[in-house]
């Protein structure tokens, strides 16, 4: 049965959504900058989480009013998308969204055409992004990488760990962040590999908040066959069940009745199982499965060797210390394969590299070599309390993402300074009518991050912006000390990818809100009446329990 709906139109619809935008943005923006404050989040279980991570806060906010909640959810989407693309900049994106929505709403309410405004916003945003790319400086070398990581995590020590990890496993190498048993944070490089295949069903996750499946000390079934009939793997499942250890299935596919059966057993808690598709295609898939088997000390169950799934025994299963699976990738840490077998496999790939004449094959062989020989860097986070540990872990995850983004697209002056620098280019756009209004909205929004950073540090935003506009290029306001400095030399930097993604996502969602003419929400259902008391029962009797 369909629920009854509440519908609001034009100004009413937009006003309700903007109330939601404001509630979320006002909560998140207090965390912006070096003097940003913390937000305390109540948790259903355990102690509250204290954080200044924008996306973590945004995901927690759920409003009672359906219309307001839709506005809040749209801004939360901006934060999440920016986090997915660049790994940081979620608070900046939230502040920019709120600024564009507010400025835009004033003009729409005054009678401007929302479609014209949207066009102007899109043109101005594209110009600002190009201008950001033009002033970007490349990041290379261990020291520069450490500096970027230290700024994002607010800790020089963390900066050193991240640059060290990236040096040892490569910029695209696998770096995982785990909780340490001690008080100290430390870096360790272990044998491991990552491939680009995620879980086949989201019901297989073990951490619903992060939507990942963590398998400790698992067995690994590796096959190039399709698993459609659960009977084929039932004998193996029963053997694994006796050990009380989790299982990862890497197969050509898991479908038919096999997938729902596995999911059902996972949900019931019978056993912990995750299924993923095998990586690669054709002959390369066979080679990659063989790599995984050698790394984990297992065997590939394949028709090429005349092996059948139903005849497989526990000896064919690989093992590892830990496996993490998210929606897009699988990371195997410390496989149980023998060092000698792994070394032989690496030597084989190297000899193939020397003899191949195809550039494509060479690239794929190098990829396999990096996966086998590169290992996985593990940053083990230590802290005195569980609350501090969670906060530190979030900070390091942000820093790692920001550092990768910096290496990819370069850096610009931080603290919102780069957004002020590109104002000149955006202002030079020759637009007319509502398009020009859209451009002016973006011009005003570009000032907002600096204004908020100054405000959080106890300074007057307008004064700081005014002085910044009249300062030499590259000079900015260090909110931590209250001084005017050369931002990049001082190490106050932002990855271009972070700043660019924040602006693009904010402009996109804010434009959608401004062009909204109707909002449809579910009507809250009336509370069910309390069941009637059986006849002859004295209400006073209830007090005895």
From Swiss-Prot:
Superkingdom of origin organism: Bacteria
GO terms (BP aspect): protein refolding
NCBIfam families to which the protein is assigned, alphabetical: GroEL (TIGR02348), PRK00013.1 (NF000592), PRK12849.1 (NF009487), PRK12850.1 (NF009488), PRK12851.1 (NF009489)
Compartments where located: Cytoplasm
Function text: Together with its co-chaperonin GroES, plays an essential role in assisting protein folding. The GroEL-GroES system forms a nano-cage that allows encapsulation of the non-native substrate proteins and provides a physical environment optimized to promote and accelerate protein folding.
Stored PROSITE patterns: CHAPERONINS_CPN60 (PS00296)
Annotated keywords: ATP-binding, Chaperone, Cytoplasm, Isomerase, Nucleotide-binding
Top EC class, one word: isomerase
Organism: Streptococcus pyogenes serotype M2 (strain MGAS10270)
Entry EC number(s): 5.6.1.7
Disulfide links within the chain: none
CDD domains: GroEL
A GO cellular component annotation in the UniProt record: cytoplasm
Protein name: Chaperonin GroEL
Reaction(s) the record says it catalyses: ATP + H2O + a folded polypeptide = ADP + phosphate + an unfolded polypeptide
GO molecular function: ATP binding; ATP-dependent protein folding chaperone; isomerase activity; unfolded protein binding
Residues that coordinate or bind ATP: 31-34, 88-92, 415, 478-480, 494
Subunit and interaction comment: Forms a cylinder of 14 subunits composed of two heptameric rings stacked back-to-back. Interacts with the co-chaperonin GroES.
């Amino acid at each position: 049965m369909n629920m009854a709906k509440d519908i609001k139109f034009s100004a009413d619809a937009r006003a309700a959504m903007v109330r939601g935008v404001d509630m979320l943005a006002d909560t998140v923006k207090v965390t912006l900058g070096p003097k940003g404050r913390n937000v305390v989040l109540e948790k259903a279980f355990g102690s509250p989480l204290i954080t200044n991570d924008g996306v973590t806060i945004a995901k927690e906010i759920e409003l009672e009013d359906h219309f307001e909640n839709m506005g809040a959810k749209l801004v939360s989407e901006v934060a999440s998308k920016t986090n997915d693309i660049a790994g940081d900049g979620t608070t900046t994106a939230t502040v920019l969204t709120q600024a564009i929505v507010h400025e835009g709403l004033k003009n729409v309410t005054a009678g401007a055409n929302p479609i014209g405004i949207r066009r102007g916003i899109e043109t101005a945003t594209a110009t600002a992004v190009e201008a950001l790319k033009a002033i970007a400086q490349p990041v290379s070398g261990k020291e520069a990488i450490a500096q970027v990581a230290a700024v994002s995590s607010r800790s020089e020590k963390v900066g050193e760990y991240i640059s060290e990890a990236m040096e040892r496993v490569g910029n695209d190498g696998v770096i995982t962040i785990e909780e340490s048993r001690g008080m100290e944070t430390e870096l360790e490089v272990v044998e491991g590999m990552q491939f680009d295949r995620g879980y086949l069903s989201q019901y297989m996750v073990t951490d619903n908040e992060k939507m990942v499946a963590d398998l400790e000390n698992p067995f690994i079934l590796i096959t190039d066959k399709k698993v459609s009939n659960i009977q084929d793997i039932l004998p193996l499942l029963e053997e694994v069940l006796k050990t009380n250890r989790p299982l990862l299935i890497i197969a050509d596919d898991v479908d038919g009745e096999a997938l729902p059966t596995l999911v059902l057993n996972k949900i019931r808690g019978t056993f912990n199982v995750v299924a993923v598709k095998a990586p690669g295609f054709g002959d390369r898939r066979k080679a990659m499965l063989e790599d995984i088997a050698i790394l984990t000390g297992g065997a590939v169950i394949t028709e090429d060797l005349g092996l059948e799934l139903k005849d497989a025994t526990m000896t064919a299963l690989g093992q590892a210390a830990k496996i993490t699976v998210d929606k897009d990738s699988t990371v195997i840490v410390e496989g149980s394969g023998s060092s000698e077998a792994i070394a032989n496999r690496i030597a084989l790939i190297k000899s193939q590299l020397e003899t191949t004449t195809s550039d494509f094959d060479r690239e794929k062989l190098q990829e396999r070599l990096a996966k086998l020989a590169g290992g996985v860097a593990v940053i083990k986070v230590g802290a005195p309390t569980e609350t501090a540990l969670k906060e530190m872990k979030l900070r390091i995850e942000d820093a790692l993402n920001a550092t990768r983004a910096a290496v990819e697209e370069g850096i610009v002056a931080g603290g919102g300074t780069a957004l002020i620098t590109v104002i000149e280019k955006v202002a030079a756009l020759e637009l007319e009518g509502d398009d020009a209004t859209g451009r002016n909205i973006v011009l005003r929004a570009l000032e907002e991050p600096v204004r908020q950073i100054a405000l959080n540090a106890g300074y007057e935003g307008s004064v700081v912006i005014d002085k910044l506009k009249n300062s030499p290029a590259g000079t900015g306001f260090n909110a931590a000390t209250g001084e005017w400095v050369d931002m990049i030399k001082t190490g106050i930097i932002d990855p271009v990818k972070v700043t660019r993604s924040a602006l693009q996502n904010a402009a996109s969602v804010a434009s959608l809100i401004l062009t909204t003419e109707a909002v449809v929400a579910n009507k809250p259902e009336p509370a069910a009446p309390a069941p009637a008391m059986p006849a002859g029962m004295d209400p006073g009797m209830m007090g005895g329990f």
